[in-house]
């Protein structure tokens, strides 16, 4: 029987430099969700353009910039997963008023597209 090792890594998933390429079978993560107000500060601290876009009521740009930050996480996950490995992402969509517009910010679709663009596949529900 093949021995497996379970290890929990807590830290910034944008840089998993201590983790070898193609060495992880399962990644479970719950990132901050773009366009949920409680996470605005975390995103804005990483890219000042986000706070500027939010102040200008530019939801589309804010959403895009936040997802650009998360793309670094998705790229690292793709790098460390073994072929056939699984990325389990807890994803929440956002509904929010920006200026006079109330809308859905579809985080799920954006994140799934990022993984598919990185060559991964979506599992059925």
List the predicted regions and their residue ranges.
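S-adenosyl-L-methionine-dependent nucleic acid methyltransferase catalytic domains
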Residues: 1-125
């Amino acid at each position: 029987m093949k021995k497996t090792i379970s290890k929990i890594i807590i830290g910034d998933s944008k840089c998993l430099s201590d983790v070898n390429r193609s060495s992880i079978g399962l990644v479970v993560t719950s990132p901050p969700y773009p366009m949920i107000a409680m996470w605005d500060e975390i995103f804005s601290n990483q890219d000042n353009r986000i706070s500027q876009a939010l102040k200008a009521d530019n939801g589309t740009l804010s959403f895009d910039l936040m997802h650009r930050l998360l793309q670094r996480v998705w790229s690292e996950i793709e790098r460390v997963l073994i072929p056939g490995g699984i990325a389990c992402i807890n994803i929440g969509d956002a509904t929010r008023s920006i200026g006079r517009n109330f809308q859905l910010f579809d985080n799920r679709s954006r994140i799934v597209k990022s993984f598919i663009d990185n060559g991964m596949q979506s599992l059925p529900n």
